[in-house]
Swiss-Prot record:
This is Pterin-4-alpha-carbinolamine dehydratase 2. The modification N6-acetyllysine is found at K114, K118, K125. The modification N6-succinyllysine is found at K114, K118, K125. The keyword Repeat does not apply. Involved in tetrahydrobiopterin biosynthesis. Seems to both prevent the formation of 7-pterins and accelerate the formation of quinonoid-BH2. GO terms for cellular component: mitochondrion. Transmembrane segments: none annotated. It comes from Homo sapiens. It comes from the Eukaryota. InterPro entries: PCD_sf, Pterin_deHydtase.
């Protein structure tokens, strides 16, 4: 039964895509969030000024944050997690004690998008408020 329902869902999505219909935010293509070359260059300059770096092995940005203790790091991560969930855009991150390493990219298209830039800006504000 689950296989049938899964197939029906896939068929529904395919038909909607062929008709050009939207299925909502969850099914929205990252194409609508792609950066132009000019937007990307400006975003990278702004993010680098804030301490972010581009990864050489893939189209992503990275930054490590340090806090006074684990509680501050965890509070920061909780705040970012709530925003990421609202955006339906989730960071790759790693936490040890007071350090949080964050990588942002859009996995569905394999590149940096407006969503990554927006989340990075939120992350900066969240870190500054800890």
């Amino acid at each position: 039964m689950a296989a049938v329902l899964g197939a029906l869902g896939a068929t529904r999505r395919l038909l909607a895509a062929l008709r050009g219909q939207s299925l909502g935010l969850a099914a929205m293509s990252s194409g609508t969030h792609r950066l132009t070359a000019e937007e990307r260059n400006q975003a990278i300059l702004d993010l680098k000024a804030a301490g972010w770096s581009e990864l050489s092995e893939r189209d992503a940005i990275y930054k490590e944050f340090s806090f006074h203790n684990f509680n501050q790091a965890f509070g920061f991560m909780s705040r970012v997690a709530l925003q990421a969930e609202k955006m339906n855009h989730h960071p790759e991150w790693f936490n040890v004690y007071n350090k949080v390493q964050i990588t942002l990219t859009s996995h569905d298209c394999g590149e940096l998008t407006k969503k990554d830039v927006k989340l990075a800006k939120f992350i900066e504000k969240a870190a500054a408020s800890v």
